């Protein structure tokens, strides 16, 4: 077998592989010799079929098997012998001419194919001893815990029907039909909808007009959808809602006690506070971790500068760009609405994709040298977390992970990355710094920079509680950002 390098340009490689027809024929004859005693052909005793006849009957199929085996096995062997790792699966090209293919299968012509791929760049690891990061630490006060417990209690509070007029804080149960230009619009109708006046869950002006209504009353409410409303067919338009009030209920007293805890399925009020404190600690811990990780990645990004495989960058960029456009479409916005242009956005995301690929390669090399591995238990837990997001589809999801190596890799990658970060935290200089809640939540200069690369958040449309599917109201005004938070985040190298 001849292996000839025909292209070595940057990270691109092209290898021509030639297996002489004589070698292919010899391998075919070996296969025929191995199976001749097992083959049954009418008119011949077992093991007595002439070799020429066997070759005539089975030669092409055996040669086809040999070709498939070579194409399947040799690329990895060739890369290994060259001491190279390909960035993606090598592309394999061979003749598509039927006459040439027939000559190869009959050992009249050498079998040739070409491998095209990009190599992973060699990375010479540098010492991380000079990396210095600050870990922000926050003390959680009893007041903050009590404040959150109170919110939990308010969400679980009971309401009691009343005969008087509705006031701020009362819960209204109602049917309504929304209309624009006297025509009911999709998603603007509901029955038995519940709304706490003053909760801000409906579009501006809607809830205020419910103050003073009574059970059994019918009322027409007039509102104007915000100009930046996600549903463009409703944005800026005046709408009316014909409301029938079914019930007005006053909120019960909020008491944090064992009875409340029991209602929530918790043994005691003290245990409820412990759980809430743990949740707050987890939330702050995640934010601290995110800031810490950003500092590490930023410094690694400064330390390593090398060419990245275009195939990996393109794949990363395409993923980011797809999510950017999906998020913009769902928010009903354009690049101009986000104070940028498509051309500028593409440049930013291309740079971001290159950074993420470069950091991913660096972290991979660091992890490999440090012996970082993702255990089977860690994979199982991560897959279980995925299954919980799709109740009733567990069997299909499991089969998907079993049959698609790429799916398992997408689960493994973030786990591996976090374990490498854990390893780095044992090697670098970490200084703890006590901060306030406001300081922890504040963006530093680096975060503010990255924030400009995140897309407008998805905006729930609601003229009814929790958002009407067709987008007839809003829960919160979106912040102006230019890229999706998850995919465009610089806090990850995945």
Swiss-Prot record:
Pfam families: FKBP_C (PF00254), Trigger_C (PF05698), Trigger_N (PF05697). It comes from Rhizobium etli (strain ATCC 51251 / DSM 11541 / JCM 21823 / NBRC 15573 / CFN 42). It catalyses: [protein]-peptidylproline (omega=180) = [protein]-peptidylproline (omega=0). The lineage of its organism: Bacteria, Pseudomonadati, Pseudomonadota, Alphaproteobacteria, Hyphomicrobiales. Keywords: Cell cycle, Cell division, Chaperone, Cytoplasm, Isomerase, Rotamase. This is Trigger factor. Its EC number is 5.2.1.8. GO terms for biological process: 'de novo' cotranslational protein folding; cell division; chaperone-mediated protein folding; protein transport; protein unfolding. Transmembrane segments: none annotated. Belongs to the FKBP-type PPIase family. Tig subfamily. Involved in protein export. Acts as a chaperone by maintaining the newly synthesized protein in an open conformation. Functions as a peptidyl-prolyl cis-trans isomerase. Its main location: cytoplasm. Consists of 3 domains; the N-terminus binds the ribosome, the middle domain has PPIase activity, while the C-terminus has intrinsic chaperone activity on its own. The keyword Isomerase applies. Residues 169-254 form the PPIase FKBP-type domain. One of its GO terms (cellular component) is cytoplasm. It is an enzyme of class 5 (isomerase). One of its GO terms (molecular function) is ribosome binding. It comes from the Bacteria. It is found in: Cytoplasm. The keyword Cell cycle applies. NCBIfam families: tig (TIGR00115).
